[in-house]
């Protein structure tokens, strides 16, 4: 729910005109208290600015109204594309890197050249308009940003986590989320994304771009198999001769001295078996391809005496 008020409201407000000349600096703590108060008192709250000013010690009604106007201008500039938002790459719309750091320090986003965002990675205007419901993924990103930046820092949560939502939309979503949690189980006749309270990074990591690549072509797969098979020529091998067949086996480095030999018919547990028709003067070749071992079985139609 959008909570931005029209600009005309500020121009006609006596509070804003009377104290427009005062210039005060806002600390990080004051900004958090201010944005947290915005999440509590929406635009339909009577005497909204007086109540917001009460939540920010040392600030007057005119101060909080002017700060809100500046916030509104920032949001408008971001949506118009005048302010570059970090987190976009010129090659990939959105890239996540999960490091080994503690907490959310391992959560990084790629940056494009000069901090510019690509046109393909920019959220559509429809996604930022009023009335578009939040998705479960957006809510999880909101929880991650809430844990990193805390309550009130809606601007950083919007810029670095929920990039498809404006800071005011994040503040409004936070208001609904906290009201849902404070209800203590009441009025929960139907499920809501606001019931999701934690995000487990080990279970909910965003898939890396490598996992989203399309399946490789058969030629590419064959090239990979040929590359991997080149490492087998140095592995130890064994010869085993029986009355009617000769078997050459390759053992992996973890299983020296072992030869994997299977039934000539049916399915092998280490791979798929391809069997040809035995001819009178010919033979058939069984090939086994497994994750760790490779064996070739050749049986000839001719009989050789045992040594």
Curated annotation (Swiss-Prot):
Single GO cellular component term: nucleus
CDD domains xref list: SANT (cd00167)
Keyword Ribosomal protein: no
Pfam families for this protein: Myb_DNA-binding
Record field: compositional bias (Polar residues): 196-206, 222-231
Superkingdom classification of source: Eukaryota
UniProt keyword list: Developmental protein, DNA-binding, Nucleus, Transcription, Transcription regulation
Protein name: Transcription factor DIVARICATA
Chain's gene name: DIVARICATA
């Amino acid at each position: 729910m959008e909570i931005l008020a029209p600009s005309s409201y500020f121009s006609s407000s006596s509070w804003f005109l009377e104290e427009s000349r005062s210039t005060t600096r806002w600390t990080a703590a004051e900004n958090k208290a201010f944005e947290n108060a915005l999440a509590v008192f929406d635009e339909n709250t009577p005497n909204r600015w007086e109540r917001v000013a009460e939540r920010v010690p040392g600030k007057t009604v005119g101060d909080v109204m002017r700060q809100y106007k500046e916030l509104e201008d920032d949001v408008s500039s971001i949506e118009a594309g005048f302010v570059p938002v970090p987190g976009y790459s010129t090659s990939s719309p959105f890239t996540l890197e999960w490091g080994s750091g503690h907490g959310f320090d391992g959560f990084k986003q790629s940056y494009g050249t000069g901090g510019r965002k690509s046109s393909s990675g920019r959220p559509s205007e429809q996604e930022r308009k009023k009335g578009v419901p939040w998705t479960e993924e957006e809510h999880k990103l909101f929880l991650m940003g809430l844990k990193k930046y805390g309550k009130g820092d809606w601007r950083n949560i919007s810029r670095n986590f929920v990039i498809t939502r404006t800071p005011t939309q994040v503040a409004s979503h936070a208001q609904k989320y906290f009201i849902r949690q404070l209800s203590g189980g009441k009025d929960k006749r139907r499920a809501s994304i606001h019931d999701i309270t934690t995000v487990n990074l080990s279970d909910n990591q965003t898939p890396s771009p490598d996992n989203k690549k399309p399946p490789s072509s058969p030629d590419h797969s064959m090239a990979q198999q040929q590359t991997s098979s080149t490492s087998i020529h140095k592995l130890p091998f064994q010869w085993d001769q029986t009355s009617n067949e000769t078997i050459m086996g390759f053992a992996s480095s973890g299983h020296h001295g072992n030869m994997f030999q299977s039934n000539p018919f049916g399915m092998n547990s280490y791979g798929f078996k391809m069997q040809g028709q035995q001819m009178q003067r010919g033979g058939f070749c069984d090939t086994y391809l497994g994750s760790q071992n490779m064996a070739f079985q050749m049986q000839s139609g001719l009989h050789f005496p045992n040594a």
